[in-house]
Every structure is written in C-alpha cells, then in structure tokens.
C-alpha cells in the first residue's frame, strides 16, 4: 500500500505526476487556502504533507496527524513551521532552495527599477487617458525618477538570493554593500561587495533590498528609527517577509518623505495590507510573486517530489531543514 500525501494547494503537474508513482496523492483543489479545521481533519490519515507558507504547521497539526513523518514546504522559507516541535516529534521538514533563486532575485530588480523609474505611475498616466487629456507629448520634468547605474545598493541578507541580487547589481556598475549574520570573504572578493553593520548600510545606500528570513531577531528590524537613517532619496525593496518591516513606520516614512519610495512583494498579514499603502504613489505593490515564474514553480514542485521520494526510499531528503531529526528517526515510512 502506498503512503498517503496531502498537498494543500494545487502545484504544477510535473511534481504531482512524480508523486503519483510513489504515493496516494490528495490535492486540495480549491483556489482558496485550506482552512485550519479542514487541515486538521485531513491530516489524520496522511503520512506526508506538502504545505504552503499560508499554513501554520505546529504542535496542534502534529498531534492531529499520528502517521505524519515528513512535511515538504513549497517555499524556501519555513517560518510557518514549528521546527523545534517537528524535530521533537520526529517529523522531517524540507524546503525548496536554489530552484527559485534567480526568479526571486529578478523580482527584487523588477521592484527596484519600477519604483526608481516610477513605472506604475507612468502606466496609470497613460491608461487613464490623462496623457492624452493633457495634450503634452513630452516634457523635460515628466515623471523624473532616480538613477540606478553607478549608485549604491545595500543588501540585507546575503544568502543565495542576496548574492544573486548582488551579481545583477555588478552589471549596473553599483557599489555593493551587504549585511548578514556572517561575513562571506570569498563572495566579497568575487563581487567586490563590502560587509557593513546594518545601520551604516542604511545610511550609505541608495537602494536597500531586504532578503532576510523572518526570525525573532528580524521581526520589525526596519522600524521608524532605522527608516530615519536612510537617505531621503533612498528606495526600500522588501522580498523577504512582511513582518521584517514595521508597516506603520513605513507608511509614515513614505508619506512624510523620509525615504523616496518602496517596492513591496510581501506584507505583514497577507493577503491584507495597510490601506494607506494603496493611496501612495511612491510605493509599488505585488502580491507575493517573487518566485512566480513557470520555471521556478515547476522546479519547486520537482524538488518537493524528490524530497518525498527520497524519504520513502529510506534516504535523507536533499533539502532537509532540521537535520537534528536524524537523531530521532531514520528516513522512511516503515
């Protein structure tokens, strides 16, 4: 009898097809996320679980799922999962790094460039008919934005995605600053990047890109005090997690001109956002689509399947997050 896996949202078919060869597969087909009540009911008889960032996987879920042995998170981040509790219960946790690195780095640049050059404002100006209404084809002061080439970028979080952003910055002839938990001398040498304490980085940078995981230490790390350190011409880009930024403080900074603009792909309480953000022209908003390319999402689906299949075969999953679990339980459904 095949082990049973529940996939809490429809993912690309390539991953589902791989899983069907080894598992009894149930997919939550609804466009809306699975409710907490339904999730707790459905996990009662599953051996494996494929989850999204929108699902909180904690002790309550583990207690409701006596057969559950592995959770494959369809994301790089895993702040939606209680890793300590999972390890204690002998549940393996995997994620999907690498395959979405370039797509997410590209998204940071989409937001950076769109904000710097006021692209969304300009698009609205054309679509609304205002350009035609004004009858002015071109004006020297129309939609002036900020130069990118040769400026200074500060990258907060210098893992795979942060480094990919830096490689793109090199092509723009930028000075590259970074902040992370540990220095990376080899990458500094490769990219000409400079390590800098966070507050100094904020003062020096024309563009600040946030790529850190959400932890107790990074919660609201960009607050009112730190926003005031930034240049009034600076632009903040957040592709990390919404709660890394104090949204109330950011709205105030954008409204009062402490910084020039912001590009946001993540929000504190998704799918909800601070209503005042919607009324500000100097912010570009996207609905958490950093990895939303065909290639990245298919790569994520394949990696999810590879992790589960490896576990079923008694092998350590390729992207195991909680390696301490190896001391609690061997891989496999036996």
Curated annotation (Swiss-Prot):
Positions bound to NADP(+): 158-161, 180-182, 239-241, 288-290
Record InterPro entries: D-isomer_2-hydroxyacid_DH, D-isomer_2_OHA_DH_cat_dom, D-isomer_DH_CS, D-isomer_DH_NAD-bd, Glyoxylate_reductase_GyaR, NAD(P)-bd_dom_sf
Species per Swiss-Prot/TrEMBL record: Thermococcus onnurineus (strain NA1)
PROSITE patterns, sorted: D_2_HYDROXYACID_DH_3
GO molecular function, one term: glyoxylate reductase (NADPH) activity
Pfam families in alphabetical order: 2-Hacid_dh, 2-Hacid_dh_C
Family: Belongs to the D-isomer specific 2-hydroxyacid dehydrogenase family. GyaR subfamily.
Catalytic activity: glycolate + NAD(+) = glyoxylate + NADH + H(+)
GO cellular component, one term: cytosol
The organism's taxonomic lineage, starting at the top: Archaea, Methanobacteriati, Methanobacteriota, Thermococci, Thermococcales
Matching PANTHER family: 2-HYDROXYACID DEHYDROGENASE-RELATED (PTHR10996), GLYOXYLATE_HYDROXYPYRUVATE REDUCTASE B (PTHR10996:SF283)
EC number, as in UniProt: 1.1.1.26
Compartments where located: Cytoplasm
Protein name (record): Glyoxylate reductase
Subunit structure: Homodimer.
Active site per UniProt: 241, 270, 288
UniProt keyword list: Cytoplasm, NAD, Oxidoreductase
């Amino acid at each position: 009898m095949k082990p049973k896996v529940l996939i809490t949202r429809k993912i690309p078919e390539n991953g589902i097809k791989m899983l069907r060869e080894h598992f009894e597969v149930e997919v939550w087909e609804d466009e809306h996320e699975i409710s907490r009540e339904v999730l707790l009911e459905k996990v009662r008889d599953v051996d494996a679980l494929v989850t999204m960032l929108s699902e909180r996987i904690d002790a309550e879920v583990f207690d409701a799922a006596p057969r559950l042995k592995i959770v494959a998170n369809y994301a790089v981040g895993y702040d939606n999962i209680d890793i300590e509790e999972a390890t204690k219960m002998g549940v393996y946790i995997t994620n999907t790094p690498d395959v979405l690195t370039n797509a997410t780095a590209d998204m940071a640049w989409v937001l950076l460039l769109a904000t710097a050059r006021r692209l969304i404002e300009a698009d609205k100006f054309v679509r609304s008919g205002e350009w035609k209404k004004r009858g002015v084809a071109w004006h020297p002061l129309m939609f002036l934005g900020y130069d990118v080439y040769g400026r200074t970028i500060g990258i907060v979080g210098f893992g795979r995605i942060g480094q990919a952003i830096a490689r793109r910055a090199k092509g723009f002839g930028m000075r590259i600053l970074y902040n992370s938990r540990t220095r990376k001398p080899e990458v500094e040498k490769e990219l000409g990047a400079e390590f800098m304490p966070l507050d100094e980085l904020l003062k020096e940078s024309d563009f600040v890109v946030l790529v850190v995981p959400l932890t107790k230490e990074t919660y609201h790390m960009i607050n009112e005090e730190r926003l005031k350190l930034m240049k009034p011409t600076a632009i903040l880009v957040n592709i990390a997690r919404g709660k890394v930024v104090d949204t109330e403080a950011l709205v105030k900074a954008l409204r009062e001109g402490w910084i020039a603009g912001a590009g946001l792909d993540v929000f504190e309480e998704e799918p909800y956002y601070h209503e005042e953000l919607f009324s500000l022209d100097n912010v570009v908003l996207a609905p958490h689509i950093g990895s939303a390319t065909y290639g990245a999402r298919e790569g994520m689906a394949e990696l999810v399947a590879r992790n589960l299949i490896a576990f079923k075969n008694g092998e350590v999953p390729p992207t195991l997050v909680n390696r301490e679990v190896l001391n609690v339980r061997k891989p496999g459904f036996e």
